[in-house]
């Protein structure tokens, strides 16, 4: 996607979505004269400035746009006297400086990304969904943001950690967010375990250090997390940047037809660059030398016009097939081992951000951003994310997070959500704030929406759900381990040992080894031997 295309899209949004009702801006002046005030004139100038090359910067001004003789000019009472409070340029600059950062994400704080396009290359999805977004030949602008999960914003982006793989697809029917990871499973299936699990991935509340005691104490008490831990401590846990890893939906979603019929779907993005990972030693060295290694790798490849791409594929199951599958199709700790993947399209990144804070840090993704024809499953973790992600956006950016240019749809928006902090697109002008008889937003036609889903839970009763682990939770980790090469098994043993040798609570180590023995006795033996070797030095 070329830079000027992005500018045109941004300006189109501003002009069509928010300036369509220009007559409402007309102000009656004395003498009967009528003039039209363009509320967005300054905003459009600043948007144009955003796309201006840095060699053609405008003159220096204060925050309110007044010409200024220089940034370092301060007013004081003589050369040795106190500063004057009327030195407002200094006061404004210092006040702005201490507010330059919004709260970092609770998880996925270290991130990087780029713009690109999603081309639908087949008609496979059309068989199961009426979504225009998935029609063969459709092309959509996208934003991808990659991230580590547990680290803070300044942590190494090559660290051993799952990678966030978030994609914002700007369709003509609204924004579709795919908030994926670089792994087909996750650590939890009960959403209430997420806060406490993340606590174990952060720092000890007393020492403020990463604490392997917490990490492995959580693991042995929650064996359903073992599949994700196996992937994390293999070399897959240290991918060679973002370009050489796959992305997975993890959750099961639904593709929905207009009559309300549906199938389960999972999504995988297969890297066209080939899978490539660091060893533990390489990742440690890279992280020590350059904490932004993956960020630089992606940026430099796009600058060199070596555009990374991924082939998008879907796997589907009918409701009947879902019931017959050995594992719960909505269990986030389980993969679909029998999946057949069908090509849907291709995603290509071809434009770097001009401003990281504005386009990447200020980006917001939520699985609740859906379009007709795409729907959530009853996966408990996904259901919880439908609320928590948008709520995180309200906390981090404010209630108008979807009005920032990076997040706003590339189509008009009409609803009754109003005001709040910084409604930068004009707060819908004088359009109705309730369903007015004098004129209101026109509901979408039946052709644009989907019939209500069929009843799934007739006579359902309220029950307590915990999602306790059972023997079936060891099957997929066993399959994963037994299909590793001898060298990959050796690295897995060594990687586990590198972390577990630092555990100071003996019962934690012994309980983890017992859990490994249930997965495969050779895993338990290999890790035990590697821990002994690590302690010997």
Whereabouts are the PLM-identified features?
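Active-site-adjacent core segments of small-molecule enzymes
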Residues: 2-4, 21-537
């Amino acid at each position: 996607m070329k830079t000027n295309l992005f500018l045109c899209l941004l300006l189109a949004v501003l002009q069509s979505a928010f300036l369509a009702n220009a007559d409402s801006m007309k102000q009656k002046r004395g003498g009967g004269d009528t003039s039209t005030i363009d509320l967005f004139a300054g905003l459009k100038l600043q948007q144009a400035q955003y796309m201006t090359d840095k060699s053609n910067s405008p003159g220096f001004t204060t925050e309110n746009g007044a010409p200024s003789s220089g940034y370092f000019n301060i007013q004081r009472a003589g050369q040795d006297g106190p500063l004057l409070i009327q030195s407002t340029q200094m006061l404004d600059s210092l006040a702005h400086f201490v507010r330059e950062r919004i709260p970092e994400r609770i998880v996925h704080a270290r991130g990087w990304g780029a713009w690109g396009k999603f081309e639908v290359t087949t008609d496979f999805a059309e068989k199961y969904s009426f979504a225009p977004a998935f029609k063969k030949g459709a092309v959509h602008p996208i934003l991808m943001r990659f991230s580590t999960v547990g680290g803070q914003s300044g942590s190494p982006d090559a660290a051993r950690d799952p990678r966030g793989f978030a994609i914002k697809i700007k369709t003509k029917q609204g924004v579709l967010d795919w908030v994926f990871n670089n792994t087909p499973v996750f650590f939890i299936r009960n959403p209430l375990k997420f806060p406490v699990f993340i606590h174990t991935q952060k720092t000890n509340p007393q020492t403020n250090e990463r604490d392997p005691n917490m990490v492995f104490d959580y693991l042995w008490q929650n064996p359903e997390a073992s599949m994700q831990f196996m992937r994390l401590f293999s070399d897959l846990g240290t991918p060679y940047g973002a370009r050489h890893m796959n992305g997975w939906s993890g959750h099961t979603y639904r593709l929905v037809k207009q009559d309300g019929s549906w199938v389960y779907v999972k999504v995988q993005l297969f890297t066209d660059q080939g899978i490539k990972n660091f060893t533990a030693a390489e990742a440690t060295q890279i992280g020590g030398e350059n904490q932004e290694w993956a960020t630089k790798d992606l940026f430099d490849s796009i600058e060199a016009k070596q555009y990374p791409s991924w082939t998008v594929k879907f796997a589907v199951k009918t409701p009947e097939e879902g019931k017959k599958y050995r594992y719960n199709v909505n269990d986030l700790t389980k993969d679909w081992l029998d999946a057949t993947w069908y090509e849907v399209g291709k995603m290509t990144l071809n434009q770097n951000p001009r401003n990281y804070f504005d386009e990447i840090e200020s980006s917001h993704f939520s699985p609740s951003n859906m379009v007709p024809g795409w729907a959530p499953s009853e996966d408990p973790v996904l259901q919880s994310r439908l609320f928590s992600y948008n709520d995180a956006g309200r906390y981090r950016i404010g209630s108008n997070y979807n009005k920032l240019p990076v997040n706003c749809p590339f189509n008009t928006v009409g609803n009754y959500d109003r005001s709040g902090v910084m409604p930068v697109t004009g707060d819908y002008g004088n359009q109705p704030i309730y369903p007015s008889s004098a004129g209101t937003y026109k509901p979408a036609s039946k052709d644009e929406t989907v019939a209500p889903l069929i009843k799934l839970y007739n006579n359902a009763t309220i029950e307590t759900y915990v999602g306790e682990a059972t023997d079936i939770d060891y099957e997929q980790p066993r399959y994963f381990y037994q299909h590793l090469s001898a060298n990959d098994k050796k690295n897995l043993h060594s990687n586990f040992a590198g972390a577990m040798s630092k555990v100071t609570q003996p019962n934690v180590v012994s309980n983890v080894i017992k859990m490994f023995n249930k997965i495969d006795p050779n895993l338990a033996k290999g890790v035990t031997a590697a821990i002994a070797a690590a302690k010997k030095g």
